Amino acid sequence: MEAASIGTGTPERLKRSKGLQEKQLARLMVAPSMILIAVVAAWPVIYAIWLSLHEYSVRVAGLSRWAGFDNYSSALGNSDWWAALGHTLIFTVASVALETLIGLAMALAMHAAFKGQGLLRTTVLVPWALLTVVTAIIWRTMFVSPYGFVNTIFGTKTVWLGSEPQALIIIILADVWKTAPFMALLILAGLQVIPGEVYEAAKVDGASTMQRFTRITLPLLMPAILVALIFRTLDALRVFDLPYVLTGGQNGTSTLSTIAQEAFAANRLYGLGAAMAVLTFIVVMVVSFSYIRFVGGNLRGMGDD
């Protein structure tokens, strides 16, 4: 009996020991890059927090005064900051929702087998390949008043970028035009790992195209869609370049990033600007953790199914 237990226990111990060694080796290999990322990412955050707790002057080198949470009180007591938060949330919800729906449609089109598929994929990805600043300049040229492309086509002299809510809508549309291909690319990657045999079996069972989409495609795509939503939501909350180039953050288009930049660079209120940047970081982190908990729970539930 003892010999049998030793014989069966030894391979298990060896397997467990090998697994631990592999985990330790993996940690050692990843450690240098993780340390580098932590240092590069942590230093700006630490410095921004330090700066947000001080009144800092560039006129006298090294002159700073402890301000405690005064800068945070000023930011949270500023109606412009709350307006920027509202604009940011509207931009995030609207742009991410549209990009997900359009990206899904584009991914389905790119995944379909037909002549010219390669040309379609290349054409669809062109807007995403452009620099965001270039995209903003293109859209500003289209809507600039009074002789922009849109006004010329419709024979109007509407000040599109100078009034609310048109300016924010144009920024949302510009972001959707540029970033929907990115969502399509992520969703397409999810489509390509769905086994074709599943669809063949559904066809044999008499499932319609809509039934195959709702019962097979969407459920199996959900992990890819949820991951894409995380990336885009966190990126949208930090939007800066589109509103800055198109409107300068004016006319109801200010965001958390543009108002922080205005305080920091334009008004030289470095402590206040840093406090606004830290508040933006906190908003992004809260949304990030909420998403991770939600997505993690959903993915585990899908795995159990």
Regions found by a protein language model. Give the residues of each.
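Transmembrane alpha-helical segments of polytopic membrane transport and secretion proteins
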Residues: 1-30, 114-117, 292-305
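Membrane-water interface segments at the C-terminal ends of transmembrane alpha-helices
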Residues: 35-57, 120-158, 174-176, 231, ...
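Interhelical loop and adjacent transmembrane-helix boundary motif
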Residues: 22, 57-58, 72, 179-182, ...
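Intracellular coupling helices
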Residues: 118-124, 185-225, 299-305
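C-terminal transmembrane helix and the adjacent membrane-cytosol boundary/short C-terminal tail
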Residues: 106, 188-196, 272-305
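Transmembrane-helix boundary motif in ABC transporter permease subunits
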Residues: 7-9, 18, 48, 52, ...
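Transmembrane alpha-helix signature in integral membrane proteins
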Residues: 78-112, 171-178, 209, 282-284
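Membrane-interfacial helix termini and adjacent extracytoplasmic/periplasmic loops
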Residues: 15-19, 136-177, 241-254
